[in-house]
Amino acid sequence: MKSHIQSLLEQTIESFKQQGILPADFEARIQVDRTKDKSHGDLATNLAMMLTKAAGKNPRELAQLIIDNLPASNYVAKVEIAGPGFINFFIDDSALANQLQAAISDEHLGIKLPTPQTIVVDYSSPNLAKEMHVGHLRSTIIGDSVVRTLEFLGHKVIRQNHVGDWGTQFGMLLAYMEELRAQNGEQAQLELSDLETFYRAAKLRFDESAEFATRARQLVVELQSGDEYCNKLWREFNDISLSHCHEVYERLGVSLTRADVHGESAYNADLEQVVKDLDAQGLLTQSNGAKVVFQEEFRNKEGEALPVIIQKADGGYLYATTDLAAMRYRSSVLKADRVLYFVDLRQALHFQQVFSLAKLAKFVRNDMSLEHLGFGTMNGEDGRPFKTRTGGVVKLVDLLDEANTRALELVRSKNPDMDEATLAEIARVVGISAVKYADLSKNRTSDYIFSFEQMLSFEGNTAPYLLYAYTRVAGIFKRATDIDLSQAKIVLEHEKEKDLGNKLAQFGEILSRVVDKGQPHVLCGYLYELAGAFSSFYEACPVLAADNDEQKHSRLLLSQLTANTLQKGLNLLGIETLERM
């Protein structure tokens, strides 16, 4: 509905240009907003005030002119001017009912799909050779929710799990395996079953022994030179580490697969060419033996230009070099229209610099959008980064295990007579959903406090509340199995029916915000409001005990569309629904 009003206003502006009311080259950014007070209509715009200067008319006069020139629309019951020149639109109830009716049988719930694009999404991207920890949660689940929503809206999405599968940490691991094999022979391979312990032991040796550290660096060189033995061991480390990652993805209900892995090592063969091309364009500068690029717009507090280091003095490459190679690949090979990077906000300057350099060096097409969608940190209840009691990094599997244990206790307390298998399945869904939703419901750019107590509450904007809200709506149809709705029509008469209908009609514009800005919290907020609107409707408007069949059938259709929307919305967040709790 919002997009329909915007379209009417766009047509009006074109008419003004043809009439000479506005300059022929005038471009306006049309903003239409939902009203909070329904006495002011359903939608409003301040367009008249925005056009005042260009049209040379006062806002109220211009508002009336806009209304007089609006194309006819069955969706609009009336239009009014308010205050200094706001234009308020009242949506026709029967047109809204028809829109909702059509949405029930549509797999996209009546949403008008945008022009499809090819969109690369870079997310999760853990460093291999050790297990995933809580710091990987946000990129993984925020990215996956946006990916799901993009695909639902018809875009071609290419997932890119840009894992850290290359670098000095592998030299350290290779050196440690070499030592173990010298001591224990092939039995040393068993040590890899616990990769985290293996990594910590190797790191300890690296920090304590200069000789070991030297050997580790030598092995990195051998690995990069294609040494067969080093490459074989490297593949084993990666395979074990990726297996750990995909066990976590499966538990989280994340859609990444092995086929989506395109890590740092995939660009090794391209790095030398990146350096040559930057040099050929005269962009490279020598600084303390390293090859760097200075860009005038990036300076420190002292006003000194900040470098992008492309190649170290020892010949090694850095993240920037790999990122530039990846951007070129995503532009020239994957033909991306947009590339979204779900990476910690602390990397903002890095991405600003490499995005700018990629455009400057023409590594990417001018029409390709590069977007860093950064996120804040997950903190403990003390407000500091989330750690174990001993100050260590919290493994993601340990966090999920605790969520499952707490959810099982909660579900059992509410269902003491339920069988263990059903309890376990409900607890699995509730536990994982609680962790994911607690994160996704927060503004992506904000830090947030991780609290099991809050996220497992059945009150407020939480996963348990929404899962229960869905079962409550779906439960109506368990009591209405013999009712034929094939000929039923939605009729909006009661104020709470209209409120619910208006909320349902907003689903498409909410999803547009999710994919345009990478903000799943907007969808979470909408689903919470939708559940509240249904609750108010259900209390005020008897469904199965309605006054007549026409009213009952209409309210059942509204309930069905609510259930469909809640389920689809939760699924787009990567959250399973339950039929009972």
Curated annotation (Swiss-Prot):
Q: Cross-referenced PROSITE patterns, in alphabetical order?
A: AA_TRNA_LIGASE_I (PS00178)
Q: Name one GO cellular component term.
A: cytoplasm
- InterPro entries for the chain: aa-tRNA-synth_I_CS (IPR001412), Arg-tRNA-ligase (IPR001278), Arg-tRNA-synth_N (IPR005148), Arg-tRNA-synth_N_sf (IPR036695), ArgRS_core (IPR035684), DALR_anticod-bd (IPR008909), Rossmann-like_a/b/a_fold (IPR014729), tRNAsynth_Ia_anticodon-bd (IPR009080)
Gene3D superfamilies documented for this protein:
Arginyl tRNA synthetase N-terminal domain (3.30.1360.70), HUPs (3.40.50.620), Isoleucyl-tRNA Synthetase, Domain 1 (1.10.730.10)
Pfam families hit by this protein:
Arg_tRNA_synt_N (PF03485), DALR_1 (PF05746), tRNA-synt_1d (PF00750)
GO MF, any single term: ATP binding
* Subcellular location(s) of the protein: Cytoplasm
Span of the annotated motif 'HIGH' region: 126-136
EC annotation from Swiss-Prot or TrEMBL: 6.1.1.19
Which controlled-vocabulary keywords does the entry list? Aminoacyl-tRNA synthetase, ATP-binding, Cytoplasm, Ligase, Nucleotide-binding, Protein biosynthesis
Main location per the UniProt record: cytoplasm
Which residues, if any, are the signal sequence?
none
Q: Look at the named UniProt entry and state the broad enzyme category this protein falls under.
A: ligase
Q: What Gene Ontology terms for biological process does this UniProt record contain?
A: arginyl-tRNA aminoacylation
UniProt catalytic activity? tRNA(Arg) + L-arginine + ATP = L-arginyl-tRNA(Arg) + AMP + diphosphate
Q: How does the annotation summarize its subunit structure?
A: Monomer.
- Indicate the family of this protein: Belongs to the class-I aminoacyl-tRNA synthetase family.
The identity of this protein, by name, is: Arginine--tRNA ligase
Species this protein is from: Shewanella sp. (strain ANA-3)
Gene symbol of the encoding locus: argS
